[in-house]
């Protein structure tokens, strides 16, 4: 059996899809379906069982036997960068992760987990997986950073695979439930379908991010699992592209000559807490042996637009 926590969420459900595509269906999805809209991420996927997150945590703490587990993909977390309830964030993203990590270590189960580029904070260069480059801007980033630090202490003695991925700006299918935390591509497409021009924040021409297609993220996870590689790795494309490039790709898909980008005021609450530039350093990822290319914004957004608008 393979366990995917956060399996009804964005990246988790895409990992389930990638596993399905390789013939794996003996999958336990763990999630919190209080937001019932997330069920749509699972309707076309094949899984063996579903378990509520709270019940799962209780079982892990109790040391319950789940039978033979081939891997745990731990994608379950609070991923809101605007959530400031630190206790909630640390319970969800730190304590839960530690419990599950030790459960896997005790049983030599490969453990792959979601870290984040938010660990790097507001820096504009050297996005490298080393302590001296890490200074998160929000409590979400801090919770991810702290777990990475915990893993670093454990790794030298670990007898089984432990691997974390610092996801950069992920976009693609199955993120519709994320609301304001969904990708720029998702929001721009919604605006166009609502008869509006796509909107970007003022100053967006100076913002560049490392946008990575979710299918590429899932492929990285499965490769590292198959190859039994441990460590903490950036998961981005190694390219910084502009928000304008995302808007251009959305406009190109809709092929409407009347569409143009509108600029809106930058929100006060995000000032000083916003990553204006991200670009994954892929040196360690490539050294580990991962050689596959990553989609450009133009390529990935075009694929995503086809998926989003397939029923239109």
From Swiss-Prot:
E.C. code: 5.1.3.20
GO molecular function, one term: ADP-glyceromanno-heptose 6-epimerase activity
UniProt remark on cofactor binding: Binds 1 NADP(+) per subunit.
SUPFAM superfamilies cross-referenced by the UniProt entry: NAD(P)-binding Rossmann-fold domains
Enzyme class at the top of the EC tree: isomerase
Recorded metabolic or biological pathway in which this protein acts: Nucleotide-sugar biosynthesis; ADP-L-glycero-beta-D-manno-heptose biosynthesis; ADP-L-glycero-beta-D-manno-heptose from D-glycero-beta-D-manno-heptose 7-phosphate: step 4/4
Keywords from the named record: Carbohydrate metabolism, Isomerase, NADP
Gene Ontology process terms (BP): ADP-L-glycero-beta-D-manno-heptose biosynthetic process; carbohydrate metabolic process
Sites where the protein binds substrate: 169, 180, 187, 201-204, 209, 274
Binding residue positions for NADP(+): 10-11, 31-32, 38, 53, 75-79, 92, 144, 170, 178
Active site residues per record: 140, 178
Subunit structure: Homopentamer.
Entry's family note: Belongs to the NAD(P)-dependent epimerase/dehydratase family. HldD subfamily.
Function per UniProt: Catalyzes the interconversion between ADP-D-glycero-beta-D-manno-heptose and ADP-L-glycero-beta-D-manno-heptose via an epimerization at carbon 6 of the heptose.
Protein name, per record: ADP-L-glycero-D-manno-heptose-6-epimerase
């Amino acid at each position: 059996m393979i366990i995917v926590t956060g399996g009804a969420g964005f990246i988790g459900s895409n990992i389930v899809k990638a596993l399905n595509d390789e013939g794996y269906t003996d999958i336990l999805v763990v999630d919190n379906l209080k937001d019932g809209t997330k069920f749509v991420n699972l309707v076309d996927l094949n899984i063996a069982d579903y378990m509520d997150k709270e019940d799962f945590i209780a079982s892990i703490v109790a040391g319950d036997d789940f039978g033979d587990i081939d891997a745990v993909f731990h994608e379950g977390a609070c991923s809101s960068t605007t959530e400031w309830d630190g206790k909630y964030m640390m319970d969800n993203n730190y304590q839960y992760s530690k419990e599950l990590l030790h459960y896997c270590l005790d049983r030599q189960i490969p453990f792959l987990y979601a870290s984040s580029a938010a660990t790097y904070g507001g820096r504009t260069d050297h996005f490298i997986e080393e302590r001296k480059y890490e200074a998160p801007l929000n409590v979400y980033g801090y919770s991810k950073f702290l777990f990475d630090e915990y893993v670093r202490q454990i790794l030298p003695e670990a007898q089984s695979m432990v691997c974390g991925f610092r996801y950069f700006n992920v976009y693609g299918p199955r993120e519709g439930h994320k609301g304001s935390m969904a990708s720029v591509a998702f929001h721009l497409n919604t605006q166009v379908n609502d008869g509006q021009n796509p909107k970007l924040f003022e100053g967006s021409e100076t913002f560049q991010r490392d946008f990575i297609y979710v299918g590429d993220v899932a492929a990285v996870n499965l490769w590292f699992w198959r190859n039994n590689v441990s460590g903490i790795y950036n998961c981005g494309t190694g390219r910084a592209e502009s928000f304008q490039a995302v808007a251009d790709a959305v406009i190109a898909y809709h092929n409407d000559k009347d569409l143009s980008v509108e600029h809106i005021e930058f929100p006060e609450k995000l000032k000083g807490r916003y990553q204006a530039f991200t670009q994954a350093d892929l040196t360690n990822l490539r050294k580990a042996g991962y050689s596959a290319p990553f989609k450009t914004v133009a390529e990935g957004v075009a694929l995503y637009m086809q998926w989003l608008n397939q029923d239109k």
